[in-house]
Amino acid sequence: MLQNIKHMTLKQLALTMTATILVLSGCAKEMTLNDAVSFLYEYMSIADKGDYSEDFFKANAEVALKARREMPWGKQLNDQLFKHFVLPVRVNNERLDDFRTMYYDTLKARVNGLSMHDAALEINHWCHEKVTYTPSDARTSSPLASMLNGEGRCGEESTFTVAAMRTVGIPARQVYTPRWAHTDDNHAWVEVWTDGKWSFLGACEPEPELNMAWFNEPASRAMLMHTLVFGDYDGPEDVIRRTENFTEINVIGNYVKTRRNIVTVKDSTGNIVTGANVGFCIYNYGEMFPAVTLKTDQNGQASLHTGIGDMFVWASSGGRYGTGLLHTDRAEDCGIVVTLDHNDTEMMDIDIDINPPAPGRIPAEASEAAIAANKLRLAREDSLRLAYTATFTDEVNAAERLGLATEYSDAACKQLIDAKGNWREIREFMVKANDNDLLREGLEMLKTLSRKDIRDTKCDVLWDALISAAKPNFISKNNENIYFDFVLCPRIHGEFLQPFHMEIWNTLAPYIYGNEEANEVTTPDGAASLADKIISWTKKNITVANELNARNLQATPAGTLRIRKADSRSRDIFMIAALRTFGIPSRIDQMTGKAQYMTDNEWIDIRLESATSGQVSEKGTMTMSYVPGKGTLDNPEYYRHFTLSKIQGGNRQLLDFEGGDATELGADASAKSFSTPFTLDAGTYLLTSGTRLASGKVLARMVTFVVEKDKNTDVQLVMRESKEEISVIGAMDPEALYQPLEGEKKSILSTTGRGYFLVAVFGDGDEPSNHAIRDMQSMSAELAAWGRPIMVFGQSEANAAKLRGLLDSDMTSFGIDSASEIRDMLCDGCHSETKTLPVIAMCDSFGRTVYLSTGYNTSLASQLRAVIAGI
C-alpha cells in the first residue's frame, strides 16, 4: 500500500482517501446525472457524438437513474453493473431512439410486484407481444422500428429485448455467436443479471424459465460467444480486447467446456513475428469467417478460449500470410505454429477437413405444467401481435388508403404494402410528392431503398432527400438509372437516413465556387475538377480517427460534418454524400467496398490517402468451371457453398454480391453465373468452397488465382465429396401407427409404400422449424422430381393444418405427433443424443434410416440434395 501511495499524484491520493472515508463511514457516493452523462461521453463512439444531441443522452440517463431508484432490485446493482449493463443506450449498431424514455412507465407497471427473476421473464413476454422473428438485411433496426413493424431478425430482437430490460433497471447484454460451427448461420440472444448471476434467454422467445431456449443444443456446439460491453469493463469474464469505446468479452465458458488456443507466428526464417494479425476463423457460408482477429504479443503469440472444435487460422504481417488448423483432438490447451510462407503472388491450393464440436445439450429445467402454461401465453401474445399487424396495408385496402388517381397508382400501392407499420409515413410522402408533381421521381427514389428503409424512414427525411437532391447533369441526363441510383438515392451505405444535402451544400459551396454562381457541370473535365475539389475538402477537413469508432458504426453525413471527425468508412460515406449533393454520381461499391465517382461513363476509384484523388483500376476477367460429382450440388450458391476474396497485403477481403444490383451477377450468384467472363480488378484472389456433411463436418478447399489486366482467368470450382457412401445410421418401425390429419390411425408403410421416404416432424413456430420449412419450400421442385413420399408431422391438428398450407404437394401426407411418438422413434432408433425439433429423417420401407437431422440446421437443403443423389 505504501509503495503504491508513493507513485500517486496528489489528485489521485485525495480521491482515494475520500473514497476510503466514504466506505468507512458506511456511505457511498450516489451517481449523479452529470456522472452518468460524463461516463457515456467518455466511451461514446464519435459517430454517436455527431449524430445525437447531449440532451438525448441526458434524457436517457435520467430514466436509467430513475429506474435504479424506483425498481426494487435497484439496490442490488453496484456501479459496475449499472454503468456497463443498464445505463448505455446503445446495444449493437442500431439507430438509437426514444424507446427508454417512452416505455419506462409501461414496463414498470408490467413488472410491478414481481421479483427480479420473474420480471426478466415477464419483460420477454412483453417483447414477444410486440416483435417476432423475420429474416432481413444487415442494418439493425432501432427498438421502436422493430415494434412499428412487429418483426426483426435475431440481432434486432435481442437489441429490442436488451433495451426493454435495461429500461426497468435489469442489467442485460446481447450475446453473439458470430458463426455457428456445425451449420451455416449465426445467432444473437440476451443475457440478464438477476439475483447475483447471469442467465440467458431467447429474445422475444419466452420460455417458462431462464437458461431455456431453442438454441440450448446448438449453443453446446458453439466455438465462440462474445459481447461488446460499453466502456472499460473489468469483470470476471475472459477479455478478448479493449478499445476506446468498449471491452469485448468472451462468455463461451458460461455455456460449454473450453480450451485455450495458442497461435505462434513465425517468419520464413523461423523468427517470431510480433504485431501480426491472427484471424481465428470458423467455416460458415462458404468462407473462413474471422470470428476474432488478435495481434501477436512480444512472444509472437495470440491466444483465445473457444469451444472444442476445429478452427482455421489465417495470420498475416508485412504483406505475407500463412495458415494453420487448430484440431478437435486436443481437448486441453492447443498450440500451433503458423509460418508466414506466402505473399500475394505465391499460389495456395489446400484441402481442409473441419470438425465442429460434438453434439451436446445445455441442461434446462421446467415442469410440464409450466411449459403448457407458457404455450398458452405464447398463443395469446401471437394473437395480440397479429391483431396489430392486421392493420397494415394489403392488396385489398391499398388503393383506398392511397387515395390517389394517377398512372403511378400501382407502383405507389406496392410501396404502401411493403411499408408495413410505416405505411402512414410513406403515404404522406407519396401524397406530398404527387401534390408537387414529383410522384414519379419520389417512387423512383423509394425503389433505390431497401425494404427496411421503407419500413422505418420518416416522411420528412424522404421529402428532404427528394427536394434537396441535385438535378440531373450531363452525366446522368441520358441515363436515368445512374441519376436515380447514384445521385437521387439518399442511402449511401449502412448509415441511418437523415437529411444532409443542405448542410453539406451550405458548408462546401463557398469553398468550391467562392463568390461566383454555381454552374451546371457540362463536361467530363468539369466533373473531374468538381470531384477533385470535394475530395480535397474532405481530406483537409475530416480527420480520420478509426480508434474512436471501434464499433465501426456508420455515421450519417450530417453527423460527420458537425464534428469534422470520423472513421475511414464514415468519411467515405460523407464524401459520397457530398459528391451526390453537387450532382456527381458516386457510390461505395457493394462488391469491393471502394468509394467511387463516375465521369465520362467510367467509375473512378477515390484514393484519399494518395496524391491523386482518383484513378481507374486495371481490370481483368474470370470464369469458373464446375462439374458436379455424384452426391454434390448441381449449381453451388455463392455465400452458401463458395466465396471469393481478394488478397492484398496478405489480408483477405470478401467480395460481397448480396446487394443484388451491385454486380451483373445479382444477389442469387451461383457457379453457373460465372460461366461467362466476370470483370474484376486485377490482382490475386482466393476461392473458398465447402461441402457440409450431416454431422456438421466440412470438407473445405481453398485455392488462389491471379486475374491479370485485360486477360481472362479460368478457375475450377471443386465441391469435395465424402468418401463415405450413404450408410445406414439407425432403424425405425415402418409399421408404426400414426394419426393422419384426417381419418383414423394407420401405419407409416400403408402411406409410403415400398422404397425410400422422407419424414419431417416440426415444432410450432420455433425458429429452427421455420428455417427447415423454408429449406423444404426451396426444394419443392426437386422433391417433386424425386417423386418419393414425404410425411410431415405437426404438434397439433392446427399446427399440422398450417404445415399443409405451407408444404402441400401430391406426394406429401400430413399427420399429428402430439405425443412425440414419431419423433422419439426416429431419434431413439439412431441413438441420437438430442431430440430437438425439427427432426428430419430419410428412411426406407425396410426400417432403415440413412439420414437424421435434429434441431437447428441451415444446411438442410444441401444435405438432403446430397442424400437424394446418393440413394
Regions found by a protein language model. Name each.
Residues 748-772, 776:
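Short active-site neighborhood of thiol/selenol oxidoreductases, capturing the structured segment around
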Residues 268-287, 309-310, 530, 630-660:
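Short, ordered, surface-exposed loop/turn motifs in non-cytosolic proteins
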Residues 319-343, 693-720:
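Structured interaction patches on ligand/partner-binding surfaces of diverse proteins
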Residues 836-854:
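A short, hydrophobic beta-strand/beta-hairpin element that forms part of a small beta-sheet core
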Residues 284-305, 651-674:
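Short, acidic Ser/Thr/Gly-rich low-complexity loop/linker segments typical of extracellular
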Residues 803-837:
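Short, internal strand/loop/helix patches
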Residues 109-114, 119-125, 134-144, 152-241, ...:
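Hydrophobic/aromatic-rich core segments of domains that either
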